[in-house]
């Protein structure tokens, strides 16, 4: 699974393939990030994983 943190201006802030790493990142940065999107692989569509 690929996770991508998006800022409010739609720029990418952080990317990872680790669910634990993204959970930890959200806990620390939840006030400054806009959305986290995820997808299973390069050919799969994106889905919202977390949203402010």
Can you annotate each of these PLM segments?
Residues 9-15, 27-52:
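Short, mixed-charge low-complexity intrinsically disordered segments
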Residues 22:
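Short amphipathic alpha-helices within nucleic acid-binding modules
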């Amino acid at each position: 699974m690929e996770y991508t943190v998006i800022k409010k201006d739609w720029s990418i802030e952080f990317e990872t393939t680790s669910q634990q790493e993204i959970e930890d990142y959200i806990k620390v940065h939840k006030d400054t990030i806009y959305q986290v999107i995820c997808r299973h692989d390069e050919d799969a569509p994106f889905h919202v994983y977390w949203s402010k």
